[in-house]
């Protein structure tokens, strides 16, 4: 990619940037897209960057109106950037805790936050991340070693849209068609006719090997790629096809008398431990190696990671700190000094996450949260609230920090105004906090009975809950078989994490994805099978029609994800209102 060769002049005079229509379009798209990530996060533990969807829809609507209406102003490059900044900030709000620490806190303590306090908390940790990004911006964007791959992908799409308008219109049609198809399938399955979950035998059905009619899972499979897809398949076979029958045979897991159908809830109580251990150890090992490499490159380049605060932005930064600390004390009963201690840790870990994202494009939010949990497990042992909410502070701020750093990368290339981007990001997290919390409460009105089930596996919740439970109660609270499983899973994760980080890329690609391997232990086998199917289908199409796949695969997959998830949230709201 060579964006500077584009016919769009980079760093041109900025016109109509933070316009009412750019902001309002981003807000509307954020309202529509935020529930998609909440839904997907609770289903499979992953989310999707909504920047490209927002770019395509915003351009399609406003440029289409401009071409049909005499005198209507064209939709500018900078308005597109503000639109995607608002929408992606809203959709990325799940990093504020909605699909991991907040539900894990409810499962461990039995306490559920009301809507308004939950909105305030999610907004506060995200707001802190925005200000961390503001002060990291000059040093990180000036570091030539940090490419910010995700930001560059958004930039490439943005420039491509304005250079090839017809292509953008075609991609928008593909996006909407895929969304309509998956939404229709979900609506039929929910309201008209329950699509059968076929399985070859009753035994395989009991082990969760069924055909799940979810096009969202197929769409995610198309995005994750063949390596991750096949690893999910391998993990499902190992966990649910190998370990699960052995656990039942040895009596380590007992099923209710006369039980039939998938027995996910009973089996995952054991299987989640080796899976979580594998994921945590591999991500922490990989993060440690990346940090060492980044430390050496930063030291060699003599670059600073932080800039001296200026009075204006410093007031916003101070406000964000006051919000986070006071809400920890008021909502969770955390000691004020402990609450204050979460701030420097969150700043350090968000800075680490920003550099990792700049170098690799992969946000290590899970590893950041678990590292914070381990830190406070030492400082404040046996305290669930501080363990989870310190990690929530670190993970939430890191999530928004990395999202805004990618936007700053795009903004610098096209000559956008950083202050206006910051305002757009703040509006986005405000809208996302409200919509995300409402979507979460609509989907999961009773976390204690609904989460960690076949319908809502919530693997991120299982991970955070397991780490907090282990650090709070100690390993002695677990059975001997689970302790051995944790040890073996951790050892495998450590080995794979080290190999993945140290081997050359052309060799590391043949290793299984450690995140996917561990995740397959926490997801029903049916979910892993459908995601693997999506990955294999996309790979086969790319082998036959590589150009077609490059142009439309991600767009079609994003449509499948958005269509089912939006319909799923709407169906939950409808059923909730009907029951009310």
Question: Where in the sequence are the language-model features?
Answer:
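Alpha-helical multipass membrane-protein architecture
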Residues: 1-580
């Amino acid at each position: 990619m060579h964006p500077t060769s584009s016919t769009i002049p980079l760093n041109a005079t900025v016109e109509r940037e933070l316009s009412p229509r750019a902001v309002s379009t981003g807000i509307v798209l954020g309202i529509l897209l935020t529930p998609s990530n909440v839904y997907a996060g609770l289903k499979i533990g992953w989310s999707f960057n909504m920047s490209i969807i927002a770019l395509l829809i915003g351009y399609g609507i406003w440029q289409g109106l401009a071409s049909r209406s005499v005198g209507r102003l064209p939709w500018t490059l900078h308005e597109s950037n503000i639109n995607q900044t608002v929408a992606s900030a809203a959709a990325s709000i799940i990093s504020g805790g909605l699909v991991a620490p907040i539900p894990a806190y409810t499962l461990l303590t039995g306490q559920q936050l009301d809507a308004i306090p939950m909105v305030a908390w999610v907004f506060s940790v995200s707001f802190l991340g925005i200000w961390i990004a503001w002060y990291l911006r000059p040093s990180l964007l000036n570091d030539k070693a940090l490419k910010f791959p995700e930001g560059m992908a958004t930039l490439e799409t943005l420039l491509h849209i304005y250079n090839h308008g017809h292509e953008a219109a075609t991609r928008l049609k593909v996006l909407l068609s895929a969304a309509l198809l998956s939404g229709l399938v979900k609506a039929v399955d929910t309201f008209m006719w329950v699509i059968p979950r076929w399985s070859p035998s009753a035994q395989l059905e009991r082990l969760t090997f069924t055909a799940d009619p979810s096009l969202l899972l197929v769409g995610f499979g198309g995005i994750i790629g063949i390596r991750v897809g096949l690893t999910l398949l391998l993990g499902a076979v190992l966990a649910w096809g190998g370990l699960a029958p052995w656990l039942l045979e040895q009596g380590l897991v007992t099923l209710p008398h006369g039980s039939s159908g998938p027995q996910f809830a009973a089996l995952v109580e054991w299987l989640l431990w080796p899976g979580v251990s594998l994921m945590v150890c591999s991500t922490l090992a990989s993060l440690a190696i990346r940090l060492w490499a980044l430390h050496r490159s930063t030291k060699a380049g003599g670059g600073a990671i932080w800039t001296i605060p200026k009075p204006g932005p410093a007031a916003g930064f101070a406000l964000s700190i006051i919000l986070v600390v006071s809400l920890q004390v008021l909502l969770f009963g955390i000691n004020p000094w402990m609450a204050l201690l979460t701030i420097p840790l969150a700043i350090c870990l968000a800075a680490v996450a920003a550099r990792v994202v700049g170098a690799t494009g992969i946000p290590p939010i899970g590893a950041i949260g678990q590292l914070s949990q381990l830190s406070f497990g030492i400082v404040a042992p046996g305290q669930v609230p501080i363990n989870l909410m310190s990690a929530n502070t670190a993970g939430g701020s890191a999530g928004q920090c990395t999202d805004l750093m990618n936007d700053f990368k795009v903004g610098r290339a096209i000559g956008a105004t950083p202050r206006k981007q910051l305002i757009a990001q703040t509006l986005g997290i405000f809208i996302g906090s409200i919509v995300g919390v409402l979507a979460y409460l609509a989907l999961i009105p009773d976390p204690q009975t609904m989460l960690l089930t076949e319908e809502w596996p919530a693997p991120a919740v299982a991970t955070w809950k397991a780490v907090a439970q282990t650090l709070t109660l100690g390993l002695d609270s677990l059975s001997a078989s689970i302790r051995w499983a944790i040890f073996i899973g951790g050892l495998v994760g450590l080995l794979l994490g080290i190999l993945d980080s140290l081997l050359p890329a052309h060799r590391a690609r043949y290793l299984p994805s450690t995140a996917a391997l561990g995740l397959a232990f926490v997801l029903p086998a049916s979910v892993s099978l459908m995601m693997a199917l999506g990955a294999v289908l996309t790979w086969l199409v790319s082998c036959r029609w590589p150009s077609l796949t490059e142009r439309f695969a991600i767009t079609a997959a994003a449509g499948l994800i958005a269509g089912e998830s939006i319909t799923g949230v709407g169906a939950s709201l409808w059923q909730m209102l009907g029951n009310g």
